[in-house]
Amino acid sequence: MKRALVSVSDKQNLVPFVKGLVENGFEIISTGGTKRVLDEAGIETIGIEDVTHFPEILDGRVKTLNPYVHGGLLARRNLPEHMATLEKLNITPIDLVCVNLYPFKETIEKPGVEIADAIENIDIGGPSMVRSAAKNYHDVTIVVDQADYDEVLAQIKEDGETSLATRARLAAKAFRHTAAYDSLISQYLTKQTGLEDPEKLTLSWDLKETMRYGENSHQKAWLYEDALPKAFSVLQAKQLHGKKLSYNNIKDADEALRCIREFDEPTVVAMKHMNPCGIGRGDSLVQAWDRAYEADPVSIFGGVIALNRQVDLVTAEKMHKIFLEIVIAPGFDDDAFELLAKKKNIRLLTLDFSKKDEPTKHEVVSVMGGMLLQEQDMLKEDYHDWQCVTEKQPTEEQLKTLMFAWKAVKHAKSNAIVLANDERTLGVGEGQPNRIDSLKIAVKHAGEAIDDRTVMASDAFFPFGDCVEYAGQNGIKAIVQPGGSVRDQESIEMANKYGIAMVTTGIRHFRH
C-alpha cells in the first residue's frame, strides 16, 4: 500500500483530495489540525507520532523532523542498499506529500503584528518535508498547491501514480514555494534589524498574469506582483470595463499614479509614454480636466488619465469626446460609468486613493547582469524651505505655482523642464540630452499661453546661464531649480537681468 503524508495550514478542498487518495489505495499519515479535519470527515489516518515513535514536543515545534519521516521520503527506490536500510530500520517509504506552510505572509500583513507572532509562524518541519520530497521526485510526488489536486488525482486514478514529468514539474514548483517562503522571512527579519544593504538580497514575487506581449509585439512578457503588495498600485486596481491592460498600459498607469499622488486638490494627470503631457488642477474635477486637456489637446489623445476624485457625469461627458486608453480614479458615478463604458476599448479602473501616502518600498531597475535598487522618490517638500537667490522675490502665489510645477517636473523624464501657471502645465520638455533643448520644447508647447503668471521648474540645476536667459526672453517670471552648479552665478545674473524671481531647493529630481 502506498503512503501519503498530509499536513496543511490551508485546508480548502483538502477532504475530497484525500478521499480520492484513499480510494486509490493510499494510507494517510497526518498531523495536528489536519488530522482532526480528516478524522472528522471519516477518513482513517495514522498519527505522525505512530510513524516517528516520538511525541510532538515544544508546543508542536518538533513533529516531523525525524528519520522515520525523512528516510521514507529520501530513500531512492532503485538503490537496493537504500531499501535495505529502510527494511532494517523498519521505515516505510512515503510516496506522496501534501504540505503547505504556516501562514507567515498572512501573519506579517496584520496591522501591528508583534515579531513574536511572526516568529511562531515560521514553518520549519513543513519546508523540510517539501524539500526532501522534491529532491526525490523520481519516486515521490510533492503537492504544495491545491490547484494541482485534480491533476494529481486524475493521473493516479488513470495510471496508479503520477508521471515522472509531472513529479519533476511539481518538484520545481515546490522549491519555488519554499524559496519564496524563505524570501519573505528574510525580508521581514532584515527589515526588523534595520539593515538597508544586505550582502544577499532575496525578493519574492508572485505571477499575476502572462501578458499577450511586452513593450513590442515580438517580446514575451509576464506581470509579477510583490508578495507583500502595496495597496496604492495599478496591480491592486479593480478593472470595471475594457480589455486587459497591456504591458505599456501598466507602465503608463503606474507613472500616472506616481504623479497624481503628489496632489491633494482636485487634479487630473494625463500620461503618454510615461511622460506627463498635461496636469490640471481646479476647484472641481471638471475644471481640473479642462485644464489638463488644454495643456496639450493633441498628446492627450490615446493617453492614460488619472483623477483623484470620483468621476461625475459632467467630467465623463468631456472625456467621452476623445479616445483614451485608461481612466483610473477612486470611483465613477453610475451615469458617468455608463457613458464611458459605451466605448468598448477604454479601460476603466478604480483604486483606493486613501492609501496613496502609505510608505512605499524600494523600486527595482534591471541592468544587464544585475539590478539597481533605490528608495522611491517620495520626498515631501515645503516651499518655505526654499532659498531665493535673486534680487526679485517670489510672491506667495508664485511660490504655490512653483510648487505645482516642481511636483510636475519630478515625473517627467530628464532632462526635464515644466512651464506652468497656477492652474495647469503649459508646456513640458523632457528626455533631452541637454537642458536648453528641453526648455525650447516646453516653450514651443506653451506658445501664446505664456503670460505674467507663468513659472518654470527644472528637475536639475542649470549648467550654464543660457536656460535662464532663454526663459527671460520668453516671458517667464519665476523659476524653481535645485541649484548647485559651479556656474550658478551665471544663472542668477541672468535672472536678475530679466527681473526673474528664482529659488533653489537643494533637491534634484532626476528621472530616467
From Swiss-Prot:
Metabolic or biological pathway: Purine metabolism; IMP biosynthesis via de novo pathway; 5-formamido-1-(5-phospho-D-ribosyl)imidazole-4-carboxamide from 5-amino-1-(5-phospho-D-ribosyl)imidazole-4-carboxamide (10-formyl THF route): step 1/1; Purine metabolism; IMP biosynthesis via de novo pathway; IMP from 5-formamido-1-(5-phospho-D-ribosyl)imidazole-4-carboxamide: step 1/1
HAMAP family listed in its UniProt record: PurH
Record protein name field: Bifunctional purine biosynthesis protein PurH
Gene: purH
Pfam entry (one): MGS
Entry annotated with the keyword Mitochondrion: no
Cited PROSITE patterns: MGS (PS51855)
Family membership noted in the UniProt record: Belongs to the PurH family.
Domain of life according to the entry: Bacteria
PANTHER family assigned to the protein according to its UniProt record, in alphabetical order: BIFUNCTIONAL PURINE BIOSYNTHESIS PROTEIN ATIC, BIFUNCTIONAL PURINE BIOSYNTHESIS PROTEIN PURH
The MGS-like domain, residue ranges: 1-144
GO cellular component: cytosol
GO annotation terms (biological process): 'de novo' IMP biosynthetic process
Cited SMART domains: AICARFT_IMPCHas, MGS
